[in-house]
Amino acid sequence: MAKIPLILSFCLLEAFLGAESTVFIENKEASTVLSRTRRGNSNRLEELIPGNLERECIEEKCSFEEAREVFENTEKTMEFWKIYIDGDQCNSNPCKNGAVCKDGVSSYECMCPPGYGGRNCEIDSTCATKNGGCEHFCRHDTPQKAVCSCASGYKLHEDGKSCKPAVPYPCGRITAPEMRGKVTRTENTIERWNITAHDEGDAHDEALDITEPPPPPTTSAAPAKIVPITKNDTRVVGGYDSVKGQLPWQVHLVDSRGLGFCGGSIINEKWVVTAAHCLEPGDNVTAVAGEYNTKEDDHTEQRRQVVKILPYPTYNRTRNKHHNDIALLELDQPLTFNSYVTPICIGSRDFTNNLLSNGPGTVSGWGSMLYRGRSAIVLQVLTVPFVDRVTCLKSTSTTILHSMFCAGYTAGGKDTCGGDSGGPYTNSIGETWFLTGVTSWGEECAKPGKYGIYTKVAKYVKWIRETTRLT
């Protein structure tokens, strides 16, 4: 009986092995059914095999030394390590103006193109854009480096860009207590500046016997606009009563009878600039600085006798009294500067040209408030837009030379007029005012379609500086 269970067991085993469905299959066939990723260091000692990037730094966190084993080159390892350790700092594109970004460990470096600087190459280090960031003057020390400087009476701030007063009453700065809290400047937003390599000498004289045809319309981009911020004072015909001390560089020229006939601007303690057609050598002229109300004693006036009248060397009244219409007046005694008697700033040639052509200007004087009307008693002030040369030439049959420019309103109603000649046309940058023009002539006053014509000061900068010994 004991043999029966044993025989039965063998029979069952044979039946199981002969079944159609088998449990075990060949190794190669099994690999197609079940697979797993083998580690880079499977079954071998890591120290005995060459470096593997997957094994060292992807499956596990690696050290710099382990990464170095993979690349076997320090420079390539560094490039990998900068991104591996803290991500690519250049992904956010921090570099500006076409600069190339180079990633670093927790940092980045911008490789700036020529003419740009700063951490992100955001600073245009040339004078072409935004005047090189300079508050006053910009010049090129090297072809791609802008160097800032300041007008007389100012010093360059530690930032190398802004200008701070170095004297109590620097040029072009309004300091009268009556002007505190009053906005008188235009917000300068000039983007592009045209600075030449040699921003110095005066322009060449023009031939008077050549009639200049209007140039063809230009297709270049229009100059950047400056949005003016002006005061809302009581309106006078064409202008406004100024605030006392608002125009401390304004001079009133009076004759031997004490009657005013022209204006002028203070250059320094001994010199005033005006229009050449206003007077002739030998005239008895008194320059009154600090004037405000011509019918009252303002207690701020300083009267000086004019001892020398110097028109521009090539000025010829007989041929054309408005060509090179600018003159310098030497005073018998120096003026004493204060909040009501302050010089106007004189910029370089290119600086003055850029400032002039990119925004509205401010004109002032005691001239007629209507064509052939009575003169103003209180000093008048008016903001007028600069007029492009094509429009200027089309407005008149009279020759407009390059020493002249137009300013005013096409609709008329606002303009300089008789008695304002010789007075200042000024533009501001920041809180500093610069002389950019001298009131010269016009066809009637404030007539629609006509503009005031001014002498372009930029042409005469070198002559003014040399004659007045202005530093």
Curated annotation (Swiss-Prot):
It catalyses: Selective cleavage of Arg-|-Ile bond in factor X to form factor Xa. The modification (3R)-3-hydroxyaspartate is found at D103. Residues 40-85 form the Gla domain. Residues 1-19 form the signal peptide. Residues 20-39, 186-235 form a propeptide. Ca(2+) 8 binds at E291, N293, E296, E301. GO terms for molecular function: calcium ion binding; endopeptidase activity; serine-type endopeptidase activity. Mg(2+) 1 binds at E54, E59. Disulfide bonds join C57-C62, C90-C101, C95-C110, C112-C121, C127-C138, C134-C148, C150-C163, C171-C345, C262-C278, C392-C406, C417-C445. Ca(2+) 6 binds at E75, E79. Residues 86-122, 123-164 form the EGF-like domain. It comes from the Eukaryota. Its main location: secreted. The record marks R185, T186, R235, V236 as: Cleavage. Ca(2+) 4 binds at E54, E59. Pfam families: EGF, FXa_inhibition, Gla, Trypsin. InterPro entries: Coagulation_fac-like_Gla_dom, EGF-like_Ca-bd_dom, EGF-like_dom, EGF-type_Asp/Asn_hydroxyl_site, EGF_Ca-bd_CS, GLA-like_dom_SF, GLA_domain, Pept_S1A_FX. Ca(2+) 1 binds at E46, E56, E60. Ca(2+) 3 binds at E47, E56, E66, E69. Belongs to the peptidase S1 family. Factor IX is a vitamin K-dependent plasma protein that participates in the intrinsic pathway of blood coagulation by converting factor X to its active form in the presence of Ca(2+) ions, phospholipids, and factor VIIIa. Heterodimer of a light chain and a heavy chain; disulfide-linked. This is Coagulation factor IX. It comes from Gallus gallus (Chicken). The lineage of its organism: Eukaryota, Metazoa, Chordata, Craniata, Vertebrata.
